[in-house]
Amino acid sequence: MAREYKIEDYRNFGIMAHIDAGKTTTTERILYYTGKSHKIGEVHDGAATMDWMEQEQERGITITTAATTTFWKGRDGKMRRFNIIDTPGHVDFTIEVERSLRVLDGAIALLDANAGVEPQTETVWRQAEKYNVPRMIFCNKMDKTGADFYRSVEMIKTRLGATAVVMQLPIGAETEFKGVIDLIEMNALIWRDESLGAQWDVVEIPDDLKAKADEYREKLIETVVEIDEEAMEDYLNGIMPDNDKIRALVRRGTIDVKFLPMFCGTAFKNKGVQPLLDAVVDYLPSPLDIPAIKGIDFKTEAEIERHADDSEPLSMLAFKIMNDPFVGSLTFARIYSGKLEKGTSVINTVKDKREAVGRMLQMHSNSREDIEEAFAGDIVALAGHKETTTGDTLCDPLKPVILERMEFPEPVIQIAIEPKTKGDQEKMGLALNRRAAEDPSFRVKTDEESGQTYYAGMGELHLDILVDRMRREFKVEATVGAPQVAYRETITRHDEEDYTHKKQSGGTGQFARVKIIFEPNPEGEDFKFESKIVGGAVPKEYIPGVQKGIESVLSSGPLAGFPMLGVKATLIDGAYHDVDSSVLAFEIASRACFREAAKKAGAQLLEPMMKVEVVTPEDYVGDVIGDLNSRRGQIQGQESRGITIVISAHVPLANMFKYVDNLRSMSQGRAQYSMTFDHYSPVPSNVAQEIQAKYSGQK
């Protein structure tokens, strides 16, 4: 079967935003207008097509990224293929956003017209910047009380440091919002309410908005001609670009991430969605417009590129593992190059294992269609892959490549969990391991001494939902302990240790001597190992054993057994024995050497500090600040946002549990907050003593 749509007619994009900015509703409208849904699903009814897990429908938030394929006829009458990924906006699910941005070519960033740029918008924005994802902005909820399009434009500049190119102006706002002015065509689009937004009238720009439309069209042209010398020269000579030229320049600037085209509307009231779909075609990249993906040759380790071309060797990236109640385990993958056929096999180059391509599916939210083959640019779901986990590369066994791996954040909160009955024990193990395979920001560990199982994640909601899914999907009843903070330890001083490991007990003995300098790593929180051995005091083949030995004890620090951060180790000398030395002997020696050093190098306890943002009416500002200070918070600043005040602070995670209940009672339910992990910070000594006393008893 040949390719149905040319690769230049593909648009792989995601919809990203703060929680409650209307992502799922916007996606629902897109599916409705592109003909994939016969009725519009509303989030507040629990009927949205993309929110298919039970908890999502109950809580009205999107938890897992649902992928869907749909089609849209552009302004030129040509059909385009859209692969859309709906991403969660709650900060506990940031990992889902990170995964989807990694495999997308473009994104629509949604803003709530009332709130503008919110904390999670900034978090998601930073992730999109990291992967250099071209974006457009849709200022949603223009019908909401307090909606202010122009404030949102300003916030994009001040809070995101980005340049928004305004493509439309709103006609009216709040309950008076009727439609938009198209600044390229210079006409107005007014939607007919009775048609569920399917029909609109193109009319003259209202007289009271003509001057504003002229002003913003001028700004639009000024911004876009800057990226093209010829267009700039013409403009300075009084020659204006025509509409096609403006669109071409907007497309180029968007793909090069020089600026962001900005649109407005209200998805809930069905206004502004179709022009947004036309803009996806006009301005977001096809797989051909983005740079070829880089990878490492599996055999030679040389850097190679894979282009978006069916004739190139197959390469794809697994970006999500999901358990489907009907199909079983599903691996979602983005095909970057080549062609994938049912019945063939691929190699997982990260695990060095072969996987058979059995059932291959194209997904529409939670319904599915079996397909026989897929091509470069496609997003597919593969059934029954046993070895593959998130971030793995799958490719042609004859031309193996390892694509760039994804980076995942460390969990900041952990909870002790115990099955209620012996029969639940095995099921719980299976459930936790499956969750860990699906979600790399979730970790499971068992304390060797106490036998207690802990699981760690990105926040209370993240862990609540995991327990809930375990109960629903695996029928496991478990007792859950109070949340615990994922503390870390580090060293603050330089220490040099000389350690000899010697064991003689008949037969082959063990011998290894290491001299190592331990100090804080000036480059950050990672572990850094360096060898300055000259003259073969420690043979080259034993040096990896030294590194491995130190790494094996970094998981349990000297103060309270927490993992260690920010350590640098430099091997400067050592000795070996021709017969008795081995990699294992050097591993044992370096392990003991580090344990000695950790006691003397000024070990320090670190705690996760959260960036907290509270949005509150002015009446409660004093109470909110006083409360944050009492939680060991450091106020970073405050600013006005409409009729509310936004307070920013860094607060230890340990002092933020159940904060939402306090904030509600303090503000009579009128204040809201959000928090994201910011950095690790030393724990004050009086608090550190309490923590050590509490955890040393458990370890």
UniProtKB/Swiss-Prot annotation:
Family under the similarity heading: Belongs to the TRAFAC class translation factor GTPase superfamily. Classic translation factor GTPase family. EF-G/EF-2 subfamily.
Protein name: Elongation factor G
Gene: fusA
Domain tr-type G: 8-288
GO cellular component: cytoplasm
Disulphide bond pairs: none
CDD domains noted in UniProt: EF-G, EFG_III, EFG_mtEFG1_IV, EFG_mtEFG_C, EFG_mtEFG_II
Sites where the protein binds GTP: 17-24, 86-90, 140-143
UniProt-annotated location(s): Cytoplasm
UniProt cross-references to SUPFAM superfamilies, sorted A to Z: EF-G C-terminal domain-like, P-loop containing nucleoside triphosphate hydrolases, Ribosomal protein S5 domain 2-like, Translation proteins
The keyword Disulfide bond is assigned to this record: no
GO molecular function: GTP binding; GTPase activity; translation elongation factor activity
BP GO annotations: ribosome disassembly
